Amino acid sequence: GSVKNQVVATAKIQGTNTDVTDTSDDPNTAAANDQTIVTIDPFSVIEVTKTASVTDQGDGNIGVGDVINYIITVENKGNVTLTGLTISDTLTDGNGGGLSLSSGPSFSGANKGSGTGTLLAGETATYIAYYIITANAAATMSIVNTASATAYTQASSVVSDISDDGDDN
């Protein structure tokens, strides 16, 4: 995209009723009195962030029956709208065995009002999920959870990020 700008300045000569007018000129072109055009190159970057909190079921220790609440945010750090946004959430126990979320990830909202699957430039969408700790998962002493997000630009370029890799793409 681009932004085009042109200004017309008008002033009166002091002590007279005569107007003086001049139209702005882009100094980078040979044409006289033409618009100044600034080209804006499209770029697409998303960042996935995930936080977790545990709701203890009353025994004071993290373990079987407790709920791990996940909040996943996906921020469009680029300057183009992204569509087709999907969230993938991989959950494993301490031995690498696959686990399934008890719920989610589910779309909670976006700070600029977009619906699920769309991110405007600069917009952040929030997703929620939770996992109820099972005896088998607790026996491995840890639960590993990674979220990834994938979306598409208008030109069908793929944009993705993983919540724990430190690299926004």
Per-segment meaning from a language model:
Residues 1-169:
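Exported/extracytosolic protein signature
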